[in-house]
């Protein structure tokens, strides 16, 4: 056992050989390396699989009750200062190791087929393998300075992958947005680390937790300074985990390839912020003000993310706001001290969200032959619908992932979300109300995504191409170059100016028999157009979906309570028992059957109500409800109907425009900073340069005058002599 722990440092380094091999291959024999590029996927998956085996072995030992293991190397800079670095294996580390390696392996397998036709295939695998290495290094770090080092590497890899198709201006802009937004949080994190080093003289977790347990309660250190430094640490997690108000980068990060979206949202970048708060939770617990602030930010984020997802048309962007909302649940759980519930939801959400993102990648892959490679079309749910007939395996996987995120038992997210809701009600009714209401919203917008994508009919064949922009005749290839679309313009929709209602009246107004006429039609000129239909992706892309489906079905069992001779336990609570975090889970985590059933009924009822409302407005039964004039039967009379319409319009506008937060940031910060730079430029050019140029010009003019006076003319000498005498006499006589 001890022998296994001694070699745990190998886990983060295992993916590095294939990264270096690809780099040397591209440098020394680029042609051969590119021709054999598909071969590099196998060693990438193999090495990460070895890391997964190590991680599983360590996790089994942690579950069986092993103690915490920490190994440190010391680098002595001088007699007064030494830098320690090493690795730490505890329950939190083992959980994150399994999460990163399992999801990472499945994403690599999926990417081999998804990115097979991309010119940047090797570059993608280098980035994603280094991404996994950086995240593995982050979770095994034993002190804050190591965490910050790998924190920056994780951010760097995410920026490279978000802007992977850098020839597309919108992808380059999304990369810059993610970089600038995270710079705010990373700068705060660095200041917080330096602040605690100044307070304690150490960056080790043991020393920080010792101070949190002993010094802070006894007022032996400046509490105000400690709160400020803790807030700065939390600021880093706010940016990395897309919490309000630094969440604006996450939806734009969808400009990267879909596999990396799955990895970022499931097990790497956004999970890093949750991991940081979980790792430092003993420090934050000693500061009640910071804990209250964490729970407040989490509550705002979970509600905001849910409302912004209500009216999005892009399937990946909708899932991105869903991730933002679920991260808010985790942050809320950590803020109220529900450590186990937060980690439980981190696990269940990771597998469910990876399933949904990879499923959306299969949907996009199937739509590209119809609409081209432009993300504005291939990811637009307005053009989808009826895909259950063409990609049934993807549809089944996506449906189970959707139901899991909605909180339907016995799927994974039901168990973790129900635990968070129960603890929220016990901590504060305010948090409980918002968290429960958002659970209903989650069911609504997630089932909306499913219905718009898979239910009804394939709408792309029944839309008129109405764009007048020249760019609409072009599509974006897999590697970002503009190419002419080989798609019939009679059934391609440009949605740049078309309005889609919050409740999709415009999506189902089609005769019931039109579905039988799909196939071909003749235009007025007599030309016959044959439609292209979506198709299921290859087995390489379907295999990760099926594995993630199994995880979504059964991973929730680790949090199900079982009775033993001592009391109620779960596999997860047994796993987390020997924790370095020096605190115990609150007693309310162990609940009786009646309380569990009561909480479950209320949360499932909210989820089912959200599903019903979504099906009522977006399902195939919408035409039936519309014929019954069901809405108008509830909203009779002019004023009430007008109020309902205006409310619906306001909600749609709020959601579709991202809560106007991006607009506010653009006008306040972007335009404000631009105006300040223009003012600075004017001051620099007009005042500073004016003074400098004025001095030079004045010197030149004076020199010319002196030169003219000293030219040997007697009249000039007499004139200046009389002037000097006059001035002298004036001052002398006065």
UniProtKB/Swiss-Prot annotation:
Superkingdom of origin organism: Eukaryota
GO terms under biological process: ATP synthesis coupled electron transport; electron transport coupled proton transport
InterPro entries (UniProt xref): NADH_UbQ_OxRdtase_chlpt_su5_C (IPR002128), NADHpl_OxRdtase_5_subgr (IPR018393), ND/Mrp_TM (IPR001750), NU5C-like (IPR003945), Proton_antipo_N (IPR001516)
Bilayer-spanning residue ranges: 9-29, 39-59, 89-109, 125-145, 147-167, 185-205, 224-244, 258-278, 280-300, 327-347, 354-374, 396-416, 425-445, 542-562, 605-625, 714-734
EC number: 7.1.1.-
GO terms of molecular function: NADH dehydrogenase (ubiquinone) activity; quinone binding
Any one GO CC term of the record: plastid
Catalytic activity as recorded in UniProt: a plastoquinone + NADH + (n+1) H(+)(in) = a plastoquinol + NAD(+) + n H(+)(out); a plastoquinone + NADPH + (n+1) H(+)(in) = a plastoquinol + NADP(+) + n H(+)(out)
Subcellular location: Plastid, Chloroplast thylakoid membrane
Topology in the lipid bilayer: Multi-pass membrane protein
Record key words, sorted: Chloroplast, Membrane, NAD, NADP, Plastid, Plastoquinone, Quinone, Thylakoid, Translocase, Transmembrane, Transmembrane helix, Transport
PANTHER family referenced in this protein's UniProt entry, alphabetically: NADH-UBIQUINONE OXIDOREDUCTASE CHAIN 5
Stored NCBIfam families: NDH_I_L, PRK06590.1
Family: Belongs to the complex I subunit 5 family.
Protein role: NDH shuttles electrons from NAD(P)H:plastoquinone, via FMN and iron-sulfur (Fe-S) centers, to quinones in the photosynthetic chain and possibly in a chloroplast respiratory chain. The immediate electron acceptor for the enzyme in this species is believed to be plastoquinone. Couples the redox reaction to proton translocation, and thus conserves the redox energy in a proton gradient.
Subunit structure: NDH is composed of at least 16 different subunits, 5 of which are encoded in the nucleus.
Protein name: NAD(P)H-quinone oxidoreductase subunit 5, chloroplastic
Organism of provenance: Oryza sativa subsp. indica
